[in-house]
């Protein structure tokens, strides 16, 4: 009986088929890999880094885990707006999917340095006033995010500081006159100080180096306390401010609760960790196809009053019980101390 003979391929054709199959296999595997999104983060360091931690947590809760579904490219300007602009331009050229910016001056710099990349921001000043969006409800353009009213709360911080430091007569603050929001912030601060009958010692510092020099030059007893006015250049050096205040026995009032956990006396304002967590929703929606201009800006109305009793004790301050009861968080005294008496 004749054997059944199967058709055979010419040798050259056989090799081409085999090689083609081997090359196609990796392509098929690649096609099944989920997309990894790339998110640039631009800020000025210091307490602002809390927003990065919050962003990571928020994205993970939304199913975007860092290192798996998303990669964060964090750029710290360390108080230098030129470094911020450079970082933003570099990130766009590296084709990140989105940039997350923290602080008004940083967001303005990021917008200026980029052309197409979507931007999710947190600002302490009205984003409409500063031309970042057209309106809260319909931002338009490629920017959206959150607004935390840090400038509006300067008066409240001074008021709380005066309650904690009854002898308060002179308050020192530092600000960078080159930041776009400096004029507005200092007007709010001066008006509030005038109403509280407190002298505001406003020191101009155009760079981190000038701030460091200004802190070194501050004489013990020259001021009765320090109050932050939401300047990003200054906030980037919060650790140095806290160290200087400790050495000069100077009570401090900050914006963000992260500064109090580092040793500041008190804060009234935002939690950057909470802001980052909230911002993750915007980031997720844009990565999945939403247009920034269609996502309404959210105004943050949750503020935290935090007191560090350990710092109060070191300063020899007794915090009134009425203030302790109003605080959202009190960092406790050492064991066996009477917290109700301010340690």
Predicted regions, residues:
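Short hydrophobic alpha-helices and adjacent helix-cap/hinge residues
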Residues: 1-343
């Amino acid at each position: 009986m004749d054997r059944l003979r199967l058709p055979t391929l010419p040798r050259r054709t056989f090799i081409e088929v085999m090689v083609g199959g081997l090359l196609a296999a990796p392509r098929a595997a690649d096609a099944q890999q989920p997309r990894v999104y790339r998110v640039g983060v631009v800020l000025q360091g210091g307490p602002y880094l809390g927003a990065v931690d919050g962003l990571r947590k928020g994205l993970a809760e939304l199913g975007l885990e860092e290192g798996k579904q998303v990669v964060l490219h964090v750029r710290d300007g360390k108080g230098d707006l030129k470094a911020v602009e450079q970082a933003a331009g570099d990130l766009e050229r590296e084709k990140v999917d989105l940039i997350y910016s923290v602080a008004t001056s940083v967001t303005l710099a990021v917008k200026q340095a980029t052309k197409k990349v979507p931007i999710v921001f947190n600002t302490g000043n009205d984003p409409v006033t500063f031309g970042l969006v057209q309106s809260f409800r319909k931002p338009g353009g490629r920017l959206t995010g959150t607004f935390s009213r840090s400038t509006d709360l300067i008066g409240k911080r001074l008021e709380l500081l005066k309650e904690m430091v009854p002898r308060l007569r002179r308050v020192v603050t530092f600000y960078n006159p080159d930041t776009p929001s400096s004029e507005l912030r200092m007007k709010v601060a001066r008006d509030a100080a005038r109403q509280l009958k407190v002298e505001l010692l406003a020191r101009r510092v155009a760079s981190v180096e000038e701030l460091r020099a200004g802190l070194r030059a501050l004489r013990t007893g020259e001021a009765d306390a320090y109050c932050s006015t939401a300047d990003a250049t200054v906030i980037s050096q919060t650790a140095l401010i806290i160290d200087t205040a400790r050495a000069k026995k100077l009570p401090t009032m900050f914006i963000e609760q992260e500064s109090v956990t580092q040793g500041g006396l008190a804060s009234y304002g935002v939690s950057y960790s909470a802001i980052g967590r909230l911002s993750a929703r915007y980031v997720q929606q844009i990565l999945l196809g939403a247009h920034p201009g269609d996502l309404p800006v959210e105004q943050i109305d949750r503020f935290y009053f935090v007191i560090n009793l350990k710092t109060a004790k070191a300063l020899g301050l007794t915090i009134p019980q009425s203030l302790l009861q109003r605080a959202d968080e009190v960092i406790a005294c050492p064991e066996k101390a009477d917290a109700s008496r301010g340690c």
